[in-house]
């Protein structure tokens, strides 16, 4: 099972700036400096969700073909798990924080079926800054993308993903993403 652990901490005296520490499995820690636009509500949750998406999709820490099957995520914000559950159940508006829905959408589609656990333990965070460091600036949700040979990187909308799943009569979201990627 692939394990990705993240922990988000606000940077002191810097509004909208967050350090998202991450580790792949039990070894190797990294750091993402995430800047969230000041107009966005719940910036710490958005920072952690955006870092997760960047690590899983753009950086592909578990490979480009990884989907939710065999993936375990430990996050520090309970709102992430609640948002994914609300999206999966189809009642994101009842969740109370519908503005998080576009940021958590990738976990309910491409990474559907991933085990999601809230863990506040920060003892694994190194005292020194990790050598693996990246920067991310967020004004809007990152797109869900797939690479199509001969075309390049293409964003997959929620509507396209859902229609493709219905067309295939698929039950599991991770199978839908895998087959969509294979067809592309």
Regions found by a protein language model. Give the residues of each.
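Juxtamembrane and targeting peptides
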Residues: 115-149
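RNase H catalytic domain
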Residues: 59-125
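RNase H-like nuclease fold core
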Residues: 1-44
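Acidic helix/loop or adjacent segment enriched in Glu/Asp that either coordinates divalent metal
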Residues: 34-66
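A charged amphipathic helix-loop-strand protein-protein interaction module that recurs
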Residues: 50, 175-184
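Ser/Thr- (and often Asn-) enriched beta-sheet segments in non-cytosolic proteins
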Residues: 17-21, 33-35, 72-74, 115-117, ...
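Arg/Lys-rich, positively charged N-terminal/basic patches that mediate binding to nucleic acids
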Residues: 139-176
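Conserved short-loop catalytic and cofactor-binding motifs
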Residues: 35, 39, 91, 148
């Amino acid at each position: 099972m692939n394990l990705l652990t993240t922990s988000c901490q606000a940077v002191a005296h810097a509004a909208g700036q967050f350090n998202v520490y991450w580790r792949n499995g039990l070894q190797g820690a990294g750091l993402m400096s995430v800047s969230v636009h000041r107009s966005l509500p719940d910036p710490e949750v958005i920072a952690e969700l955006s870092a997760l998406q960047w690590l899983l999709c753009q950086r592909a820490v578990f490979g480009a073909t990884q989907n939710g099957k065999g993936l375990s995520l430990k996050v520090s914000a309970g709102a992430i798990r609640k948002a994914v559950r609300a999206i999966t159940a189809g009642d994101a508006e009842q969740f109370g924080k519908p503005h998080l829905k576009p940021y958590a959408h990738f976990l309910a589609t491409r990474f559907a079926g991933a085990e999601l656990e809230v863990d506040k333990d920060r003892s694994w965070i190194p005292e020194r800054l990790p050598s693996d460091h990246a920067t991310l600036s967020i004004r809007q949700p990152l797109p869900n993308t797939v690479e199509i040979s001969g075309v390049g990187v293409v964003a997959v909308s929620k509507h396209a993903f859902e229609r493709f799943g219905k067309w295939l009569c698929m039950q599991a979201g991770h199978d839908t993403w895998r087959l969509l990627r294979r067809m592309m």
